[in-house]
A protein has these predicted regions:
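C-terminal domain-boundary segment and adjacent tail
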Residues: 10-12, 97-148
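Glycine-rich phosphate-binding "P-loop"
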Residues: 1
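Active-site-adjacent pocket scaffolds in enzyme catalytic domains
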Residues: 7-110
Length: 148
């Protein structure tokens, strides 16, 4: 099924699909990574927490996935993310102002180690509708802060 979805997306976009993020951040290691590598995926952006801020792999830098069962370094590059907007709003019950402080804190931590800052945002959260009013502006402020 996933291979078919990758092929359909590739046809629709006229691009080779090489990047992935698993829905709900569900990873079954090592099988998820083995499966997506077999389908031509070279980069994955699933490595992060749903309910917490921080790095699930203890690093802010991308790395090649090491398959412990097979005892070898694969060609799959894992890109850990620092925080998901839903973590702050839904799990940690932060408002926009509190979330901006949290984003700035993690950005500062990543900058201090010369790491790569990646955050996960969903299209709904930048719509500025319903429960996400104010989060689009927060997104823009977060980007500005990360780039400063």
């Amino acid at each position: 099924k996933l291979k078919k979805e990758i092929n359909n997306l590739s046809k629709a976009t006229h691009r080779e699909i090489t990047k992935s993020r698993q829905h709900f951040l569900i990873l079954h290691l090592p099988s998820t990574y083995r499966d997506i590598m077999n389908m031509g995926i070279t980069d994955d952006y699933t490595m992060g927490y749903a309910m917490e801020i921080g790095f699930r792999a203890s690093t802010s830098r991308s790395f090649l996935f090491y398959d412990l069962e097979m005892e070898y370094t694969t060609a799959l590059r894992v890109h850990p993310f620092a925080v998901m907007e839903g973590t702050l709003r839904d799990y940690q019950q932060m408002n926009v102002e509190q979330a901006l402080i949290a984003y700035k804190n993690i950005i500062d931590e990543v900058k201090a180690v010369n790491g790569t800052y990646i955050s996960l945002w969903h299209t709904e959260s930048v719509s500025d509708k319903n429960r996400w009013v104010g989060w689009r502006e927060l997104y823009e402020k977060m980007i500005d802060y990360a780039l400063s």
